[in-house]
């Protein structure tokens, strides 16, 4: 593939990759290793928002109902201790909550159904007024502690994947609509300037749910500021022991399940053009899929990020780290967790995909090239930066070549590349080669970390780039004019 860039191009490229990132349940933020992983991610990637389950689950201890005396009436109390600890940590790490209202406190729940190792209750409230009061009390407390102006910038999403029976009892659509109506009204009663949305559905019955949800909202004049849904790009997994092995959708069809949502939203005059937030996405939807830890995942996500912003206000990678307990505590550091970072502060290949996209944001002026294999931007100081990828989901071994010509002088340029592929940056392979230790020693972790960094190269060059990418490689490149300004008497390469 050959492309000549003139510098006058201006192509569509909405790089919203850093608006939000996912997390395991909120109570995990009380753990030391969780905070270390989030700091590691924030220092390099700097996400703006974080979204996860479990705000109202019992481990956060917010909703309390008890009797003070044998014959006394039950008293409802709210305990903000853990909530403040979590939010203070987020504030310190310069990340805001994308608030998900869920799951149900046990003493407010209408049933016993739970989900996950940590048993989040997924039944409707037995008293919708108490549920509304809980929402209002929580938001008012956050405003009191962090300030109205700040907290009003925190979006609010009602529940999580109610179209799945595990996440919402019987996947009862009408009951969810009631939950949404009550919840959204409660949010707006605190302050009309809060932004609230839903229905947070996943694939499968998503078309039916989104359409019916918007019809309900329209008919009942419910508050709605944005639409949310989730997106994963694999089929049902084949199970083997602790692991699931799903088949990836072809890269050309990675957004096929999403395409209908924009059309459904825009078919309603009152919702046309509404923001769509994809509040979860990844390749696989299970937390024990080895693909998450691989170079294939990095290349596949690189391809997705180049066009994800075309029709979506934001898209939240699920998740930033591997302190995560939906299926239980993992046995090994490379257990196929969702995270960008493996336990032990080991960046996975997909971490670098995000790091490369972050580099494109600095001094960004415009996009000058976007193809199925690369994206190139021009900066305000006339530097050209780009990312190229070679998604090979069937492991054919095919290589791709990329030849680019830039509107730069033909001499005195520097080319900087950072390469992530199965040979140069593959921490899972390092872990495999040293025997797949379930609990690696400090020295072993250090070795794996050393194998988890891109191969960085520099060279003097003309105004052309020739790049070869192996299977599932991702490469960041940067080319700019950089004349040599040697100190008096210094000659590079001279030793005598």
Where do the language-model regions lie?
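Mature N-terminal, pre-catalytic/accessory segment of carbohydrate-active enzymes
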Residues: 1-47, 471, 482-496
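Short, acidic/polar
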Residues: 7, 28-42, 141, 207-217, ...
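Cell-envelope and extracellular/periplasmic
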Residues: 10-28, 32, 54-55, 161-162, ...
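Glycoside hydrolase catalytic-domain groove-lining segments
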Residues: 37, 234-289, 311-322
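Substrate-binding cleft and catalytic face of glycoside hydrolase catalytic domains
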Residues: 45-249, 286
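Aromatic/acidic polysaccharide-binding cleft in carbohydrate-active enzymes
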Residues: 277-397
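Carbohydrate-binding surface patches
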Residues: 371-433, 471-478, 483-486
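Acidic, Ser/Thr/Pro-rich beta/coil linker or hinge segments at domain junctions
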Residues: 409-465, 489-490
């Amino acid at each position: 593939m050959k492309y000549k860039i003139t510098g006058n191009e201006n192509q569509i490229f909405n790089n919203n990759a850093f608006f939000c990132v996912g997390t395991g349940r909120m109570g995990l933020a009380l753990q030391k290793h969780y905070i270390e992983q989030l700091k590691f991610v924030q220092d390099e990637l700097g996400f703006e928002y974080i979204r996860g389950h479990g705000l109202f689950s019992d481990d956060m201890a917010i909703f309390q109902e008890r009797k003070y005396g044998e014959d006394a009436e039950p008293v409802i109390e709210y305990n903000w201790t853990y909530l403040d600890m979590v939010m203070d940590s987020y504030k310190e790490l310069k990340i805001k909550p994308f608030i998900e209202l869920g799951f149900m406190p046990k003493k407010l729940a209408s049933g016993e159904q739970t989900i996950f190792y940590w048993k989040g209750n997924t039944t409707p409230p037995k008293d919708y007024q108490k549920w509304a009061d809980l929402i209002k009390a929580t938001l008012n407390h956050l405003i009191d502690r962090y300030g109205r102006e700040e907290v009003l910038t925190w979006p609010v999403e009602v529940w999580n994947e109610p179209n799945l029976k595990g996440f919402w009892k019987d996947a009862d659509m009408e009951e969810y609509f009631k939950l949404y109506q009550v919840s959204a009204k409660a949010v707006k009663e605190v302050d009309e300037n809060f932004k609230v949305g839903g229905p947070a559905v996943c694939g499968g019955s998503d078309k039916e749910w989104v359409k019916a949800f918007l019809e309900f909202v329209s008919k009942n004049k419910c508050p709605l500021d944005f639409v949310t849904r989730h997106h994963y790009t694999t089929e049902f997994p084949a199970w083997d022991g602790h692991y699931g092995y799903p088949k990836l959708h072809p890269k050309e069809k990675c957004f096929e399940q999403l395409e209908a949502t924009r059309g459904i939203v825009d078919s309603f005059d009152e919702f046309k053009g509404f923001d769509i937030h994809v509040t979860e996405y990844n390749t696989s939807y299970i937390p024990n899929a080895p693909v998450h830890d691989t170079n294939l995942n990095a290349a596949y996500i690189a391809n997705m990020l180049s066009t994800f912003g075309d029709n979506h206000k934001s898209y939240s990678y699920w998740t930033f780290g591997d302190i995560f307990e939906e299926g239980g505590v993992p046995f090994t550091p490379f257990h196929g967790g969702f995270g960008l970072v493996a336990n032990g502060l080991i960046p996975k290949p997909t971490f670098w995909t995000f790091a490369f996209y972050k580099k494109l944001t600095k001094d960004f002026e415009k996009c000058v090239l976007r193809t199925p294999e690369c994206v190139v931007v021009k900066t305000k100081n006339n530097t050209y930066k780009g990312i190229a990828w070679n998604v090979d989901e069937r492991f054919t071994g095919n290589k791709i070549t990329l030849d680019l010509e830039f509107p730069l002088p033909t001499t005195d340029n520097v080319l900087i590349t950072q390469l992530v592929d199965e040979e140069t940056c593959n921490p899972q392979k390092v872990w495999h080669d040293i025997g797949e230790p379930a609990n690696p020693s400090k020295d072993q972790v250090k070795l794996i970390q050393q194998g988890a960094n891109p191969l960085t190269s520099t060279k003097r060059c003309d105004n052309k780039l020739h790049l070869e990418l192996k299977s599932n490689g991702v490469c960041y490149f940067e080319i700019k004019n950089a004349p040599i300004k040697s100190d008096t008497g210094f000659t590079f390469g001279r030793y005598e």
